From Swiss-Prot:
The keyword tRNA processing does not apply. This is 3-ketoacyl-CoA thiolase. The keyword Transmembrane helix does not apply. One of its GO terms (molecular function) is acetyl-CoA C-acyltransferase activity. It catalyses: an acyl-CoA + acetyl-CoA = a 3-oxoacyl-CoA + CoA. Heterotetramer of two alpha chains (FadJ) and two beta chains (FadI). It comes from Shewanella sediminis (strain HAW-EB3). The active site is at 99 (acyl-thioester intermediate), 392 (proton acceptor), 422 (proton acceptor).
C-alpha cells in the first residue's frame, strides 16, 4: 500500500479551493457582542456566494462546525442552508473537532468530492464567545426535572426546599478539559516548563505575530479574504480584526503578570489567544467543475492528516504528530514547503512544537522516525502573523489558515504550504496545499 495520499476523484481531478472568506475576528463582547455563531456563519457564507457569483442552488453539500454549541440550533450547518438561499434539499451537517473543527469540515467536503458524490461544497466554522449557553447547577437541573414530574403542591415544595441559594447561580461554559480538569492555559504552562520555553521568547513571538499582522493589514493583503460585517442594529460595521496590537512594543509584554500560574508561570494574556468571535468558510469544487465555471482556484488540497495523543501532558503538541503524517502522504519533507502556517494558541505551545519539529530525540521516541521532522525556517513561518494577533474563534481558525496561506502563496507566484493546528483533547490537524 502506498504512503502517498491521492486527493483526487475517480477522474483524477484535484480538490480545488476556489475561494475562502471570513468575518473580521473580534475580541469577546466587542464588535460581535450579541451576534450568534449561526448569524456569523450565515453572514460569511452569504457574502462568499455573492462574491463568487455562484448560484446558491448549485451547492450540493455544506459541512460546518462549531465548538461552543447552542442548544437552540445544534445543527448550525442545516440552519445556514435554510438562511442563505440554497436549495432546501442541500445536504448539510455539523461537525466539531475542537480547534481543528474547520479542518475537519474541509476534509469532509473534500472526501465527498473525491468519492464522486458531489462536485461543489462549502466548509467552514464559526464560534461566538459572546453568545454562549449559560447552564444551571446539577442540583437545580435535577430539581427542574423532578418538578416537571411532581403532581402535588406538597411534592413541588419539597423539591424546592432541597435547593440552596448557590444552586440557583448560573453556570458558565467549562473552560477545562473534561478528562483532566486542566485548562488550555495550564497545559501551555506545563509545556513551557517541560521544554524550558522562556518568558522572553514567548513575548518575542507574540510581538512578532502582532507586528506582522499589522504590516499585513496595512499592506492591504487581507482585503479579499475578510469581509465587512454589519451587525445589528446595523448602525456600525467591522472590517478589520480588533485584537491586533498595532503599536506593539516588546517592552509592553514584560509588564504583564502570568495568567495561569501567578507565582512561577510565564504564560500571560498577551502570549495567549483571547476569547474571540468570528466565522470563516471555503468553497470547494472538483478541478474540472471549477475550471468549467471559469474559476481560478486559490489552491488545491495536496494531503491532510489528523492525530491524537494523551491529554495529561503536552496535550497541545498536535502539530508535531499530524505534520509528519501529512508530509509523508504528500511525498514531501519540511524543507520542500514554501510557507508554514501554525495555529498560535499560545506562544509557549507554538515554540514547544517548533522545538519538537527539530528534535531527533522526539522523532525517534514519539514518531518512530530516524530523523527529525525538520528545523523551521522563520522566513517561511507565519509570515503574515498568527492567531496570537488575529484571535481564535475556535471553529473558524482552520479555514482562516487555509485561505490565508493559499492567498499568500498566490501573491508569491505559487508553491506549497502547510497549515497545522493543535486542538483540545490532544488532537492535531495538518493540511498541505499547493498553489499555481
Amino acid at each position: 500500500m502506498s504512503d502517498r495520499q491521492q486527493v483526487t476523484n475517480a477522474r483524477g481531478d484535484r480538490i480545488a479551493i476556489v475561494t475562502g472568506l471570513r468575518t473580521p475576528f473580534a475580541k469577546q463582547a466587542t464588535a460581535f457582542h450579541g451576534v450568534s455563531a449561526l448569524d456569523m456563519g450565515k453572514m460569511v457564507v452569504n457574502e462568499m456566494l455573492s462574491r463568487s457569483e455562484l448560484d446558491p442552488k448549485q451547492i450540493e453539500q455544506l459541512v460546518y462546525g462549531q465548538v461552543v454549541l447552542m442548544p437552540a440550533a445544534p445543527n448550525i450547518a442545516r440552519e445556514i442552508v435554510l438562511g442563505t438561499g440554497m436549495d432546501v434539499a442541500t445536504d448539510a451537517y455539523s461537525v466539531t473537532r475542537a480547534c481543528a473543527t474547520s479542518f475537519q469540515s474541509t476534509v469532509n467536503v473534500a472526501e465527498s468530492i473525491m468519492t464522486g458524490n458531489i462536485e461543489i461544497g462549502i466548509a467552514g466554522g464559526a464560534d461566538s464567545s459572546s453568545v454562549v449557553p449559560i447552564g444551571v447547577s446539577k442540583k437545580l437541573a435535577h430539581a427542574l426535572i423532578d418538578l416537571n414530574k411532581a403532581r402535588s403542591f406538597g411534592q413541588k415544595l419539597a423539591i424546592i426546599r432541597r435547593l440552596g441559594l448557590k444552586d440557583l447561580l448560573p453556570v458558565p461554559p467549562a473552560v477545562a478539559e473534561f478528562s483532566t480538569g486542566l485548562s488550555m492555559g495550564q497545559t501551555a504552562e506545563q509545556m513551557a516548563k517541560t521544554y524550558n520555553i522562556s518568558r522572553a521568547d514567548q513575548d518575542a513571538l507574540a510581538h512578532r505575530s502582532h507586528s506582522l499582522a499589522t504590516e499585513t493589514w496595512n499592506a492591504g493583503h487581507l482585503t479579499d479574504e475578510v469581509m465587512a460585517a454589519h451587525v445589528p442594529p446595523y448602525k456600525s460595521f467591522i472590517d478589520r480584526d480588533n485584537n491586533i496590537r498595532e503599536n506593539s512594543t516588546i517592552e509592553s509584554y514584560a509588564k504583564l503578570r502570568p495568567a495561569f500560574d501567578r507565582k512561577h508561570g510565564t504564560v500571560t494574556a498577551a502570549t495567549s489567544t483571547p476569547l474571540t468571535d468570528g466565522a470563516s468558510a471555503v468553497l470547494l469544487m472538483s478541478e474540472s467543475r471549477a475550471k468549467a465555471l471559469g474559476y481560478d482556484p486559490i489552491g488545491y488540497i495536496k494531503s491532510y492528516a489528523f492525530s491524537a495523543i494523551d491529554v495529561w501532558e503536552d496535550m497541545l503538541m498536535g502539530p508535531s504528530y499530524a505534520t509528519p503524517l501529512a508530509l509523508k502522504r504528500a511525498g514531501m519533507e519540511l524543507e520542500d514547503l514554501t510557507l508554514i502556517e501554525m495555529h498560535e494558541a499560545f506562544a509557549a505551545q507554538t515554540l514547544a512544537n517548533m522545538q519538537m519539529f527539530g528534535s531527533k530525540k522526539f522523532a525517534a521516541e514519539k514518531l518512530g522516525r530516524n530523523r527529525a521532522i525538520g528545523e523551521i525556517d522563520m522566513s517561511k513561518f507565519n509570515v503574515l502573523g498568527g492567531s496570537l494577533a488575529y484571535g481564535h474563534p475556535f471553529a473558524a481558525t482552520g479555514t482562516r489558515l487555509i485561505t490565508q496561506v493559499c492567498r499568500e502563496l498566490k501573491r508569491r507566484g505559487g508553491g506549497t504550504g502547510l497549515t497545522t493546528a493543535c486542538a483540545a483533547g490532544g488532537l492535531g490537524a495538518a493540511m498541505i496545499v499547493e498553489v499555481e
